[in-house]
């Protein structure tokens, strides 16, 4: 064991202010490592709050996270704080914002210990910045479908928000439409560029339809 491993074990048991100091001693001619441990109080998450979240309610953001504040029944929701898990949760909240068009979102957080030394609050600071929108949407290389037929099946639309996760989904949707018509080798490449004015995106899908496949024979 080392200091970090010991701290990790205690933190899993809600001793978030654990202090561990290792020192070496000579005992009967042998070097012995002694760990001095100050457990501190057992602390649980009493509340998780957000600031700066103008477009999403607290409850919506909490749903993106695995970390839960303490509430009944406490054996299921003990309010345990795991820093690695919480940092991963912060990334999930950031990804949620980006997938809804806030590509420049900044998120930070801080721990505030309560006076009772048994509970802590976590305050998450959100700076949303501007939301990105689709300035233009163009589809090149399509002959099987009209541009309008393809566009109406896409989540991303001109003038609408630039949903980051919709880029891959819409690329797949176009390939699916071609596959259903026998163009199973069709290739779709997406390209987006940011305009010089404001939070705007020019989006293009380039299609290489390839050959159409036919079923020659079906054997029983």
Residue ranges and their predicted role:
Residues 1-220:
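Interaction-mediating elements
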């Amino acid at each position: 064991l080392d200091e970090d491993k010991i701290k990790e074990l205690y933190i899993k048991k809600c001793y978030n202010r654990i202090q561990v100091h290792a020192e070496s001693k000579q005992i009967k001619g042998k070097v012995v490592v002694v760990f001095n441990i100050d457990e501190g109080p057992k602390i649980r998450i009493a509340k998780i709050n957000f600031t700066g979240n103008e477009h999403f309610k607290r409850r919506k953001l909490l749903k993106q996270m695995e970390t839960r504040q303490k509430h009944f029944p406490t054996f299921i929701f003990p309010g345990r704080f795991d820093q690695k898990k919480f940092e991963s949760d912060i990334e999930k909240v950031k990804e949620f914002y980006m997938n809804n068009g806030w590509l420049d979102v900044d998120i930070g957080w801080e721990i505030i210990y309560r006076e009772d030394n048994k509970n802590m609050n976590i305050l998450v600071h959100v700076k949303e910045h501007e939301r990105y929108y689709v300035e233009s949407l163009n589809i090149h290389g399509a002959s099987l479908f009209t541009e309008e037929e393809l566009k109406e099946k896409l989540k991303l639309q001109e003038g609408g928000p630039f949903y980051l996760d919709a880029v891959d989904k819409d690329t797949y949707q176009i390939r699916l439409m071609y596959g259903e018509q026998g163009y199973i080798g069709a290739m779709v490449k997406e390209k987006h560029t940011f305009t010089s004015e404001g939070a705007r995106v020019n989006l293009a899908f380039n299609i290489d339809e390839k050959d159409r496949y036919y079923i020659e024979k079906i054997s029983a």
